């Protein structure tokens, strides 16, 4: 933006960072067990962040959660940004079924964004741990 190549962050993403664009860098990912081990070795808690954003089928989401738990994952972000109540209930049920903890996040990335305010999100459902 400072160089004048784009006027906004949204324009930068549309112009340079989408699939097949110049900033689309293909890379290889570490395995799920390796990623979880790194997180835990660093003293962190392995959490699946905003799983409703991945647009998985229910079956694929369930498989991801089961694989995550089997690899040592500990929690699912049950509440994120402005998601709807049915999504929260689905994610809470997945937590319970897989004996995982629940987390919450506002999905805040930067000042001025329109989809989420810092610290402004619903509480985790009472039946989650």
Task: Describe these PLM feature segments.
Residues 1-28, 35:
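Active-site-proximal loop/helix segment associated with metal-binding centers of metalloenzymes
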Residues 23-26, 30, 55-59:
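A short glycine-/small-residue-rich loop at the edge of a beta-strand within enzyme catalytic domains
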Residues 3-7, 34-48, 52-129:
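Charged catalytic cores and adjacent phosphate/nucleic-acid-binding surfaces used
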